[in-house]
Amino acid sequence: MSSGANITYASRKRRKPVQKTVKPIPAEGIKSNPSKRHRDRLNTELDRLASLLPFPQDVINKLDKLSVLRLSVSYLRAKSFFDVALKSTPADRNGGQDQCRAQIRDWQDLQEGEFLLQALNGFVLVVTADALVFYASSTIQDYLGFQQSDVIHQSVYELIHTEDRAEFQRQLHWALNPSQCTDSAQGVDEAHGPPQAAVYYTPDQLPPENASFMERCFRCRLRCLLDNSSGFLAMNFQGRLKYLHGQNKKGKDGALLPPQLALFAIATPLQPPSILEIRTKNFIFRTKHKLDFTPIGCDAKGQLILGYTEVELCTRGSGYQFIHAADMLHCAESHIRMIKTGESGMTVFRLLAKHSRWRWVQSNARLIYRNGRPDYIIATQRPLTDEEGREHLQKRSMSLPFMFATGEAVLYEISSPFSPIMDPLPIRTKSNTSRKDWAPQSTPSKDSFHPSSLMSALIQQDESIYLCPPSSPAPLDSHFLMGSVSKCGSWQDSFAATGSEAALKHEQIGHAQDVNLALSGGPSELFPDNKNNDLYSIMRNLGIDFEDIRSMQNEEFFRTDSTAAAAGEVDFKDIDITDEILTYVQDSLNNSTLLNSACQQQPVTQHLSCMLQERLQLEQQQQLQQPPPQALEPQQQLCQMVCPQQDLGPKHTQINGTFASWNPTPPVSFNCPQQELKHYQLFSSLQGTAQEFPYKPEVDSVPYTQNFAPCNQPLLPEHSKSVQLDFPGRDFEPSLHPTTSNLDFVSCLQVPENQSHGINSQSAMVSPQAYYAGAMSMYQCQPGPQRTPVDQTQYSSEIPGSQAFLSKVQSRGVFNETYSSDLSSIGHAAQTTGHLHHLAEAQPLPDITPGGFL
């Protein structure tokens, strides 16, 4: 008890004094002392009575004689109440049911009650009409800091704020109108609380127990010893008045009194707790230390959280051995503050748990006095999460004058006495650290420092507790590794311009072999510390060893190799060209376009899969072998390239006598290997039709790269101007339209030479042939529309034969084209003009007579 001016509040109870050492028996014998024998018998009975109390052993060991008697009376009264309130069944009274089954049921009920108390946001409190605490649940310690044994059978007014005592007394009365007058109500503030109720009611004078006005819901402030409060905690009481049976109280005349009303309530904090408080409210533990912080005791929760037994904690020596080296100076500062002021204040640090694990805790230590002198230290710790601990660590680093956080402060007037374990950078792991590397050249010995000093505690710590566990090993999936390797290099740097798909395949296989060699280094290379590695433990539990991993890798490698070898025999319809391949090709084209510098560009050869290449060659050979119904049209290819955004004045241009539609945006197209084309004399009567070009030697020097979409015939059936062509990129079917004469094309395409060429709404008669995506419809030439600035498209060709003239135009002439939106690329209806600009030196070039077809 701590008393003030007419105010008394509950405080920490007096504990059982330390047992004195037994004096040796004198040689002359034991002297007869009846008083001493009586005290010894009394102490023995009290110890036996204390052992029967339903409290943990650590609580019983701290009880004094008066507390043992008080708790014994309280236990007997509670047992009498439950004997009446929870009446047993007739079978139980007669012993008809199995005793073992009854014990199991009682144990299950006990466990359920414990779980309910833990889930409850508050504690259970039963207060009699004379203001005595009849029962308080053990969870009261989590909210008020009082032990259950400290408050049972004590006056409740010692816990209530002096301004709220009158309200609590009013709530205890069944009519909310206590019989005491104002003067007696003032007695609530007296040192011993209000007087006991002198008026006892009979059941006839009291209302029924289940009446609605017997319910209670009110608020008051209770004394709180926890560090996160100001000394009082506002609580909400919700419950009802019920009869307290089985007390067997007697009046002054010796007559048995009827049961009286008592308040059965649940007290909950007004401010709801946070999620972290809910999680950690049941993990607050306390430790007892000597004045030099040597542990001498720990409660059951502390042993559960830290993993140590009380013997292991008390036999290690200084308590600083359990504190992280980066927190030692911070805790030492709080230790000195506690010695000076009696309380350390809130201190956040890391405690060493069992199995070399660190736990962030928030601690507050108090100095306990005995006979006016400091005797020992009681520390209350609350576990924190790692995020909370790091947040406090950052605040500490910013506020303190030197680095408590990393241990860089100077101790014992030596410069940097700490070993490399204190170095925050780089992070050291078990895989790259050995005991020899850890030890400095001149490590101070343990004997050179005081046993209770910080340096001695630091040296006694094992350096393995500061080693981080090794990072997880590389994944064993060969597809993941091959995908990562393939994304690291560009196609331009990895392969030669004249290479083929075999080079790409060989390169990927080489990477896979390197990965397999790296992964086949064995357990010693892949797992530096097998015993402490989680993956190794999982593999061992599943019965998988490193030989199995190598076998799976080899099987995957041969499966991939055999699939690639047999790709040429797969039907063309079964080839699955995924979005990943198309995306990768498009990204490669974008990268190559960005590398262009002025008019020079390094030649880049686009490689595709061998399966597509072989299939396309086979299809084209079959087309050439079939006799055409009419004169064969020359097989050409249309390119679609990514163009840089430049505004130039476009013109309409005929290349080799045909009109090409170039897409200014990068479409997703098939890239096919170039094939040598044959020349056919189709329109020998037309003027300006050139079958032999004087620019053939310059084909290989063209600094442009071109993506081609395969096509057998660029001429399509007639379409309306308003119809936009949209051909699928995978399913190709021959046209079913009737055949027309080739002379119709001549009449449609012959226009005066001095006119610009545009697009007419009239459709052209075309000769049907098998076509693929990328082939565009042809229309009659009309005067071109007004010139508008459009984007620039760059392309180049590397094909022999009839494309020599196209290469010459690219290298020496500047041609700009403007087309209607009808000739835009497939799927791009938003583009109003199509264009083609060849990036080359601007030189005058005479008009080309329109003739010939692509």
From Swiss-Prot:
Main location: cytoplasm
Top-rank taxon, per record: Eukaryota
Pro-sequence residue ranges: 1-9
Region (Disordered): 1-38, 425-451
Classification via Gene3D superfamilies: Helix-loop-helix DNA-binding domain, PAS domain
Claim: Transcription is one of the keywords in the record: yes
UniProt-listed PROSITE patterns: BHLH (PS50888), PAS (PS50112)
Residue numbers spanned by region DNA-binding: 37-65
SMART domains named among the record's database cross-references: HLH, PAC, PAS
Motif (Nuclear localization signal 2): 36-41
GO biological process: cellular response to 2,3,7,8-tetrachlorodibenzodioxine; cellular response to 3-methylcholanthrene; cellular response to cAMP; cellular response to forskolin; cellular response to molecule of bacterial origin; circadian regulation of gene expression; negative regulation of DNA-templated transcription; negative regulation of inflammatory response
Polar residues bias: start-end ranges: 440-451
Region (Required for maintaining the overall integrity of the AHR:ARNT heterodimer and its transcriptional activity): 49-81, 116-124, 264-266
Domain PAS span(s) in chain numbering: 111-175, 270-340
Stored InterPro entries: AHR/AHRR, AHR_bHLH, bHLH_dom, HLH_DNA-bd_sf, PAC, PAS, PAS-like_dom_sf, PAS_fold
Keyword Membrane: no
Posttranslational mods: Mono-ADP-ribosylated, leading to inhibit transcription activator activity of AHR.
Residue ranges annotated for the bHLH domain, each copy included: 26-79
Motif (Nuclear localization signal 1): 12-15
GO molecular function, a single term: TBP-class protein binding
Sequence motif: Nuclear export signal, positions: 63-71
Subcellular location as annotated: Cytoplasm; Nucleus
Record note on domains: The PAS 1 domain is essential for dimerization and also required for AHR:ARNT heterodimerization.
Assembly: Homodimer. Heterodimer; efficient DNA binding requires dimerization with another bHLH protein. Interacts with ARNT; the heterodimer ARNT:AHR binds to core DNA sequence 5'-TGCGTG-3' within the dioxin response element (DRE) of target gene promoters and activates their transcription. Binds MYBBP1A. Interacts with coactivators including SRC-1, RIP140 and NOCA7, and with the corepressor SMRT. Interacts with NEDD8 and IVNS1ABP. Interacts with BMAL1. Interacts with HSP90AB1. Interacts with TIPARP; leading to mono-ADP-ribosylation of AHR and subsequent inhibition of AHR.
Protein's job: Ligand-activated transcription factor that enables cells to adapt to changing conditions by sensing compounds from the environment, diet, microbiome and cellular metabolism, and which plays important roles in development, immunity and cancer. Upon ligand binding, translocates into the nucleus, where it heterodimerizes with ARNT and induces transcription by binding to xenobiotic response elements (XRE). Regulates a variety of biological processes, including angiogenesis, hematopoiesis, drug and lipid metabolism, cell motility and immune modulation.
Protein name per UniProt: Aryl hydrocarbon receptor
Source organism: Mus spicilegus
